[in-house]
A protein has these predicted regions:
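Short, aromatic/basic amphipathic alpha-helical patches
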Residues: 203-207, 479-491
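Short, low-complexity, Lys/Arg-enriched N-terminal segments of secretory-pathway carbohydrate enzymes
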Residues: 1-15, 47-56
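Conserved catalytic-core segment of nucleotide-activated headgroup transferases in glycan assembly
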Residues: 445-474
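Leloir-type glycosyltransferase catalytic cores
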Residues: 551-608
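A donor-sugar binding/catalytic signature common to diverse glycosyltransferases
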Residues: 174, 194, 509-561
């Protein structure tokens, strides 16, 4: 009996060992399968990366083949050399980088305000895209908070989009955003809507918010000074909760029909419903940029407000100098408040001071100046805002330069075209890859005095342009025969010549891409009165300041006007801001704005 029990016990033990062994074999097999799958996946992923790198390498060559141009022997030798260098760059910047262990594929999809990553947007390589970057990464700047921001009290700024073309809309938006930052208020973006001339195509987005052009979320995340929310969020948070009151009666007023989402609504609905409501519950400033400068005290202390009031009184008691007094004679950027005020006075009648009444308002609303009670903000932010503290002034100019820039999709599309342009120039034997550019404004432009014929424009610019050189023309002229005289003296290209590099890009972005391509030209000719030309010139100022190019200390750069005749070389002189502000951009927006960063610590208040 005992022997049988021992035998049975041994059998059970043997059976258990066998079971354990089978389980171990099964688990080992599962692990091996998983490893094989991962290796196959990595191999496929690795191969895809190589294919992607190969496509990036060859997209410029494919584009050049379409031009069907003959190349000289010297050009071919140069191209062979460039191709070898291109392959070396690919090895370093693409293939080896793609093979790094533990690299998260989602990293390529992350947008950032620092630098420019074109991988998620169809190229070009970052090595080629880096020339687009005029903005700087200044961590200490990101910590600055307006001393006018009220502790523990949420305040807002709302505004109505300008009804003009894109660059008028952008200009007004920049002004409003900088005011929100200066006031320490949350900026409320208007709803997504149709914008003038940005409504092309029924199969693509044709109504927009500013977040479709600028990295609003990233700006708000990176910058302690600015909070940005949508109109829908604002109306739900403050309107439906009964926190908004009629400015005149003090009674609680809810949004019309309790509606909060106006995205995609027509202009009439937005105007009659939403904007009328905001004008009812918000304090609407009567400030007119043509008549006054929007002045901000250093702090909310009544003593600082008094300083601005005394400055205003001083200006009223003397004859203020005209802009001619400051041509090529700017004050230092750290000059006294009164000197800086004189330089930017521009024949206005006084200061509009952000005093206690405005500082205490829960909501300030800027109404568009056509039918509303506010003034149209057709003015550059730096021509309207005045800061008692010069360091706050240069900080604000850096804020715009370093943060309010086009989204990566637009930047990268322009970078692809610029790379193709430079390789085109090199293929003709010019190793520098430099091209020149025009912005020729015609179309619906109301300033007919600038409507010169082609021969007049060629004659005005001949001295500065390179004979037979490559010229990029940004234009709204639809009649291609207008440019036949240009083709006789230059290798002329347009945005349409690079459509193969813009597949999948919303055509409503083409104007912005045009401006970025023109901004990187060696010599640029634009049109007086055009805000499109103006923005190109500001971008060129940013680039020249970063590169420490010739004349950067005075704000000069290698740009001209083909119209008007008497203003051709205005950008080779320092001009202070003057009316009409929108007609051009001024060097005060980019000149020496990095001065004083090292002493900025006392203003950088980190409230995180």
């Amino acid at each position: 009996m005992a022997g049988n029990e021992l035998l049975n016990s041994n059998r059970r033990r043997g059976s258990n060992v066998t079971n354990y062994f089978l389980i171990i074999l099964f688990l080992f097999g599962c692990i091996q399968c998983v490893v094989n799958i991962q290796q196959d996946s990595f191999g496929d992923h690795h191969q895809e990366k190589h294919i992607e790198a190969f496509q990036r390498k060859h997209f410029l060559k494919s584009h050049l083949k379409d031009t069907k141009r003959k190349k000289s022997d010297a050009s071919l030798e140069n191209n062979d050399r460039n191709e070898e260098e291109f392959e070396e760059e690919l090895d370093v910047h693409d293939i080896l980088e793609d093979e790094r262990e533990n690299k998260d594929d989602n990293d390529d999809k992350e947008e950032t305000l620092v630098g420019l990553n074109c991988k998620p947007h169809g190229g070009p390589m970052n090595e080629l895209a880096k020339e687009m970057v005029y903005w700087e990464d200044i961590p200490i700047d990101n910590k600055f908070i307006s001393p006018l921001q009220k502790e523990g009290k949420k305040q807002y700024l709302t505004f109505e989009s300008d009804h003009g073309g894109w660059n008028n809309i952008r200009m007004a938006m920049e002004t409003v955003m900088t005011m929100a930052v200066a006031m320490g208020r949350t900026l409320v973006l208007p709803p997504e809507q149709h914008m003038y001339l940005l409504d092309k195509g029924s199969s693509q987005r044709s109504y927009f918010s500013f977040a479709h052009f600028f990295e609003m979320d990233l700006i708000s995340q990176e910058h302690t000074a600015l909070e940005v929310i949508s109109m829908d969020e604002f109306l739900k948070l403050e309107g439906l909760s009964g926190n908004l009151r009629d400015i005149k009666t003090g009674e609680i007023v809810f949004p019309p029909n309790n509606r909060t989402n106006y995205d995609g609504a027509d202009h009439r609905t937005i105007s009659k419903k939403l904007e009328a409501y905001l004008q009812q519950v918000g304090l609407v400033p009567p400030w007119d940029p043509e008549k006054c400068m929007m002045a901000f005290p250093t702090t909310a202390d009544p003593a600082d407000i008094k300083v601005l009031q005394e400055l205003n009184n001083s200006a009223a008691s003397v004859k203020m100098p005209t802009y001619e007094n400051f041509i090529d004679k700017p004050y230092p950027v750290d000059a006294s408040p009164f000197d800086r005020m004189k330089e930017n006075w521009a024949g206005r009648s006084g200061l509009c001071i952000y005093d206690k009444e405005w500082q205490d308002a829960q909501l300030i609303h800027f109404a568009e100046g056509y039918d509303a009670k506010g003034a149209r903000l057709l003015v550059h932010f730096y021509a309207f805002l005045f800061f008692e503290d010069w360091q706050q002034d240069t900080w604000m100019k850096r804020f715009v330069r370093d943060h309010i820039r086009y989204v990566d999709e637009i930047q990268c599309a322009a970078a692809r075209i610029i790379a193709a342009l430079r390789e085109r120039v090199q293929s003709y034997g010019n190793d520098s890859g430099k091209y020149n550019a025009f912005h020729i404004r015609r179309g619906d432009f109301q300033y007919t005095v600038t409507r010169y014929d082609a021969l007049h424009i060629i004659k005005n610019s001949a001295k500065e342009m390179t004979p037979k050189g490559t010229v990029y023309i940004a234009t709204d002229e639809k009649d291609q025969s207008f440019f036949d005289p240009f083709r006789k003296v230059y290798d002329v290209v347009f945005l349409d010549d690079f459509k193969d590099l813009l597949k999948g890009v919303n055509t409503n972005y083409y104007g912005m891409i045009d401006s970025l391509v023109a901004a990187r030209s060696e010599v640029f000719f634009g049109c007086w009165f055009s805000t499109f030309t103006g923005y190109i010139n500001r971008l060129r100022g940013y680039h020249n300041n970063k590169e420490k190019g010739e004349g950067y200390e005075m704000g000069y750069h290698n740009s001209y006007y083909y119209a008007l005749d008497d203003r051709k070389d205005h950008l080779h002189h320092f001009y202070p801001v003057k009316k009409s502000f929108y007609a051009r951009e001024f060097p005060t927006s980019w000149r020496l704005i990095d001065k004083g960063i090292e002493e900025f610590q006392h203003l950088a208040i980190n409230k995180e």
